Each structure stands twice: as structure tokens, then as C-alpha cells.
Regions:
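Exposed alpha-helical structural elements
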Residues: 1, 17-20, 35-38, 46-58, ...
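Internal, active-site/partner-interface "lid" segment
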Residues: 1-43
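Acidic-enriched, low-complexity/disordered segments with a strong bias for Aspartate over Glutamate
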Residues: 6-11, 17, 32-34, 50, ...
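Electropositive nucleic-acid-contacting surfaces
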Residues: 29-77
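Gly/His-enriched, cation/cofactor- and phosphate-binding structural elements
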Residues: 60-168
Length: 168
């Protein structure tokens, strides 16, 4: 199940089990690779089932946490003519935005956070016609990525201007 997550293999297992097992193992082992190896060498069907159940609970918690944070801290902005939903967060993935992102209203999602030197920013989209890698390069020439997911950096001054105007 762990390897299916690493390569986004949706065919061999039920994807909800893959995600739940992944989160259950993260909760059990953290990021300790040696512990993961040791645990998996002893794992049996009951252990796998327990990890899936634990992972389901963790995922439910994350969904509720994201929903609350999006409700309190997200805002809409204009990004080079596209409608975006934005939030200051350390959770850099599109699932953070699931409770508020509406493809009928929004073209992209933009998480951002301060890392002590600059603002780290990402763009995500579900729309085929939007190329967020081009938008990331437009925001900062060093930015880029894939058509549906990209990143870039902003200075304090540029971020403050964006936050004041809600436009980029």
C-alpha cells in the first residue's frame, strides 16, 4: 500500500485504503524510515487493517481542520486575470482547499507561507485551460512547475502589495 501511494497507482488497491494506510503509518512511525522498515517486516493483515482505520481517523481530522482554517483564513484574489482562492498555510497541497475551492467560481488555489527569508507560494488548478506554471513564472521568473501545480517565491514587499490589493 505504501508503494502504491508513492507512484499514484490507483489500480492495484482501493485508493481510499492506500491513503488511509499512508496516514496511519505516518501517525504510527512519523518520518522514521528505519521504524517503517521494522514495522513492515512484522506487519500482518490485522496490523494493516488497524493502520487503515487509524488513517481514516487522521484524514477525517485533517478534513475538518482544513475546513475550519479555510473558513476563517482564506480569501479570494485576482491572479493575472484568474479567480483564485488563497490562504496563508504551511499545508501545500490542493486537498487543503477542498472545502472552499469551487471550479465554477475559482480558477486556481494559492497556498503561501513565510519561511524566514521570503514567501513560498504555490498555484494549483483543476482546469485544463489554466497553466499555472506560466502564472508562477509570471509572478517570479524563477518560478515554475507543471501545468496543474507550480511554485514560486515572493519578497515581503511583493507579498504585502498582493495582500493589500488582492491582485497580482
Amino acid at each position: 500500500l505504501l508503494s502504491a501511494y508513492d507512484v499514484w497507482d490507483h489500480d492495484r488497491f482501493e485508493w481510499s485504503d492506500v491513503l488511509s494506510f499512508q496516514y496511519g503509518m505516518r501517525g504510527y512511525c512519523g518520518l522514521d524510515v528505519d521504524m517503517v522498515r521494522e514495522v513492515l517486516n512484522k506487519a500482518n493483515g490485522e496490523f494493516v487493517s488497524d493502520m487503515i482505520r487509524n488513517g481514516e481517523a487522521i484524514i477525517e481530522y485533517i478534513i475538518e481542520k482544513n475546513r475550519g482554517e479555510m473558513k476563517m483564513f482564506s480569501f479570494e484574489a485576482d491572479i493575472f486575470g484568474y479567480k483564485a482562492i488563497c490562504m496563508n498555510t504551511t499545508e501545500f497541497n490542493s486537498t487543503t482547499f477542498e472545502s472552499m475551492y469551487d471550479p465554477r467560481k475559482h480558477d486556481l488555489m494559492m497556498p503561501f507561507c513565510w519561511n524566514g527569508r521570503f514567501f513560498r507560494c504555490s498555484f494549483y488548478t483543476t482546469k485544463e485551460e489554466v497553466d499555472v506554471s506560466a502564472l508562477a513564472r509570471k509572478a517570479n521568473p524563477g518560478g515554475g512547475g507543471h501545468k496543474a501545480a507550480a511554485g514560486f517565491q515572493l519578497s515581503v514587499e511583493d507579498m504585502m502589495e498582493f495582500l493589500k490589493s488582492k491582485e497580482m
